[in-house]
């Protein structure tokens, strides 16, 4: 952000050991480093603020610390990544120095640093509570796939939408682009505090989409349009793909 300095921004990376499809995911080796360390490296390369990893397992804690990154232990019982990063925030920044919190998922080892930076840009508008990312869908299958979350948004510039709704359905109806939501968030501190204080909302439960809690509470979410979707590692096949991507970058 143009008028923020390094100390204003805190990048938090939640990491959970419990993964049904890929057990021990944070410690999976990618080009000689654990995945969670690769994610922390990408976040550091974004050069937007202090990077802290929020973990729920002593082995992951020790691994991250050994790699030279700041790490904080959090409860195993959190229902969402937002709850985990809020616990971490209270522990590592109790005085409230950080004004903006960027939540980078711990399974995005190939994310481009520029993509991390892009999530902050919507917060340049004082009216925006939460910034996030989106990309135009160019694959017909993705337009109807429930696992591809769509942003229904009103264009406010060539590269930004004001989020009106998020859905797993194919929407909006009619001719025009559809947008895939990328679940990386930048919060104003007060917005994160309010968000976690709210209980799950009606539409959040129905769509299984946490961000709807914010919209139902009247909070504003704007989405920056980016060029690439970061690879989320959820399966062994994803892990192999991530290894190929990072290996190619290193060579």
UniProtKB/Swiss-Prot annotation:
The keyword Protease does not apply. GO terms for cellular component: cytosol. InterPro entries: Cytidylyl_trans, KdsB, Nucleotide-diphossugar_trans. It catalyses: 3-deoxy-alpha-D-manno-oct-2-ulosonate + CTP = CMP-3-deoxy-beta-D-manno-octulosonate + diphosphate. One of its GO terms (biological process) is lipopolysaccharide biosynthetic process. Keywords: Cytoplasm, Lipopolysaccharide biosynthesis, Nucleotidyltransferase, Transferase. CDD domains: CMP-KDO-Synthetase. Pathway: Nucleotide-sugar biosynthesis; CMP-3-deoxy-D-manno-octulosonate biosynthesis; CMP-3-deoxy-D-manno-octulosonate from 3-deoxy-D-manno-octulosonate and CTP: step 1/1; Bacterial outer membrane biogenesis; lipopolysaccharide biosynthesis. It is found in: Cytoplasm. One of its GO terms (molecular function) is 3-deoxy-manno-octulosonate cytidylyltransferase activity. Its EC number is 2.7.7.38. Gene3D superfamilies: Spore Coat Polysaccharide Biosynthesis Protein SpsA, Chain A (3.90.550.10). It comes from the Bacteria. Activates KDO (a required 8-carbon sugar) for incorporation into bacterial lipopolysaccharide in Gram-negative bacteria. Belongs to the KdsB family. HAMAP family: KdsB. PANTHER family: 3-DEOXY-MANNO-OCTULOSONATE CYTIDYLYLTRANSFERASE (PTHR42866), 3-DEOXY-MANNO-OCTULOSONATE CYTIDYLYLTRANSFERASE, MITOCHONDRIAL (PTHR42866:SF2). NCBIfam families: kdsB, PRK05450.1-1, PRK05450.1-5. This is 3-deoxy-manno-octulosonate cytidylyltransferase.
């Amino acid at each position: 952000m143009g008028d923020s300095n390094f100390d204003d921004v805190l990048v938090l990376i939640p990491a959970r050991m419990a993964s049904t499809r890929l057990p021990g995911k944070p410690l999976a080796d990618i080009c000689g480093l654990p995945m969670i360390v690769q994610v922390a490296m990408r976040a550091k390369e974004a050069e937007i603020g202090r990077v802290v990893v929020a973990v729920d397992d002593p082995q992951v804690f020790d691994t991250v610390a050994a790699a030279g990154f700041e790490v904080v232990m959090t409860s195993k019982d959190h229902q969402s990544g937002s709850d985990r990063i809020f616990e971490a925030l209270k522990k590592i920044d109790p005085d409230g120095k950080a004004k903006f919190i960027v939540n980078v998922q711990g399974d995005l080892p190939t994310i481009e640093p520029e993509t991390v930076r892009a999530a902050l840009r919507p917060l340049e508008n004082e009216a925006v509570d939460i910034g996030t990312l989106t990309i135009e869908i160019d694959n017909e299958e993705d337009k109807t796939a429930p696992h591809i979350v769509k942003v229904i948004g009103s264009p406010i510039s060539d590269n930004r939408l004001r989020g009106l709704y998020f859905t797993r359905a194919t929407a909006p109806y009619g001719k025009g682009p559809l947008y895939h939501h990328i679940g990386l968030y930048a919060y104003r501190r007060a917005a994160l505090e309010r968000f976690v204080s709210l209980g799950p909302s009606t539409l959040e439960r129905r769509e299984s989409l946490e961000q709807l809690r914010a919209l139902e509470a009247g909070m504003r979410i704007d989405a920056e349009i980016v060029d690439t979707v970061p690879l989320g590692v959820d399966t062994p096949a994803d892990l192999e793909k991530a290894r190929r991507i990072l290996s190619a970058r290193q060579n």
